[in-house]
């Protein structure tokens, strides 16, 4: 009987398959972590924007002057969001006592995730008794072209 030393090809293929599964799992976990981090960043930045705008306009009857002020310089928040798009801030055309924060340049999945997230202090969230997100958005456009809008104010 002849004894062989080393590994057979089947054993090596098995080891490579196991390594492939481990690598794919690690990549998936890293991706989930990055997405979670981006969502937290958006949450923090929108909160800073809203707080800064409310503080700056607290002495006024409405937010109609928001178009004349660079809110990003005023609040210290970058206009670019973590997804490569931009934030936008504008007075609600139907009610100058409200303003709209838009998050532009989202993929479809990120758009859906941010649209259903609860946005405390937003108009839709307050009026629904804290049962709905308070955000609206169109999430059917190609990736990078979706927008979520959140209305704040009275």
Regions found by a protein language model. Give the residues of each.
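N-terminal single-pass transmembrane signal-anchor helix
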Residues: 1-34
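Short N-terminal micro-motifs specific to bacterial/archaeal maturation
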Residues: 3, 21, 40, 102-105
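Short, functional N-terminal and low-complexity linear motifs
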Residues: 13-20, 39-40, 77-83
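Membrane-proximal N-terminal amphipathic helix
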Residues: 28-65
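Periplasmic/extracellular, small/polar-rich flexible segments of pilin-like filament-forming proteins
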Residues: 55-154
